[in-house]
Amino acid sequence: MTETKKNITIGVGEWGFRALPMREHFQIAKKFGFQWLEFGIGGDQVGRLSEAPDQAEIDEFKALGTEYGIKTPFCCIENDFTLADADEHAAMVDKVKSQIQAAAACGATHVRLFAGFIPAGNVTGEIWGRMIDAFAKCDALCEELGLWIGIETHGGIEFNDDGSTTHINSVTTDAAYLQRLLTDLPPRVGFNYDPGNIKVVNPDDKLCLLDLLNDRINYCHLKDWSRCGQGWVAGAIGDDDLDYQPIFEQLKFDGICQIEYEPLEDTEDGIQRSLDYLGRIEQASDIVAFKL
C-alpha cells in the first residue's frame, strides 16, 4: 500500500442478520474482525431492537458493544414518508421521532431512514411537501440530539412468484427526483449511498448516480444484485457486474462503508466473498485500500 492510497474503513450492515438474535450479530462481526456494526430498531425482525425499546433493552444492547469491543453508531429505522393518508403519515412521523430518540439513547450518531416506496411518478405535490416536512422535523430533532440522517437510495420493490424482486424507481433512485431532494431537503440531511439499489433501476449508469450524490453521502452500503428469472436477487459485491473500483476511487465520503449482504442462507459466506472482492480491488487500484 502506497502513502497516496485512500484508506476506506469497512463495517457490516444489519439486514443480513435480521433473523438472528442480536448477540449473534456481534459474534459474527467479531469473528471477521469488524469494529463497526449497524443495528436496527423496529420492523418486527428477530434481529432488531423492539419498536419502542425501554431502558433495560437499550442497556443490554450497549453492553454487547462493550463486551465485544464493537462500535454501533449506525441505526436503521423502518419508515415511509410517502404515505397517501395524512393521518397515517403523521403517525409515521411521530413513530420515527420516538425511534430517533431511542437510537440516540443507544449511542447512534447516524440514523438510516427511507423517503418512501411508491413509484416516483405517483408522488403528488401534496405527498412531496409532507415528505420534505417530515425530514425537516426529524432533522431538527436529530440536530438537538447530535445525530445525522442518511436517506437510503432504495426503490420500490415487488416480490415475484419465483423469489426474485422487481425494483421500481422511487424518489431516491430517480435522478430528477434526487436533484429535487438535494434542493428541498435541509442541508444537514445526507444520503445512504447504496450503489446496488441504484443499479437495479438504472443499470446503464455504471457510477450509480455518484456524480449527483457525492457531496451529500454520509452513510454507505455495499451490495450487488443479479438478474434472476422475472427480476433480481441480492448478492455480495463482486458476485455480479457492478464494478465498485471506480466508485470507491471517486467517492468523497470518508466514513464507514458497510457490507450489506442480504440473503439469510449463507450470511457469513457472503460477507467473506465481499471482503475477498475488496481485496481484489485493493490489488488492482493505485488509489484505494481497505481496513476493518
What are these regions (language model features)?
Residues 48-55, 85-89, 123-124, 268-269:
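Metal-dependent catalytic neighborhoods of phosphoester/phosphodiester hydrolases
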Residues 38, 74-76, 112, 150, ...:
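Conserved beta-strand positions in the central sheet of alpha/beta enzyme cores
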Residues 16-18, 41-43, 78-81, 115-119, ...:
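Active-site-proximal loop/turn and secondary-structure-junction residues that shape catalytic pockets
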Residues 24, 63-68, 82-193, 200-203, ...:
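Active-site acidic/histidine proton-transfer and metal-coordination neighborhood
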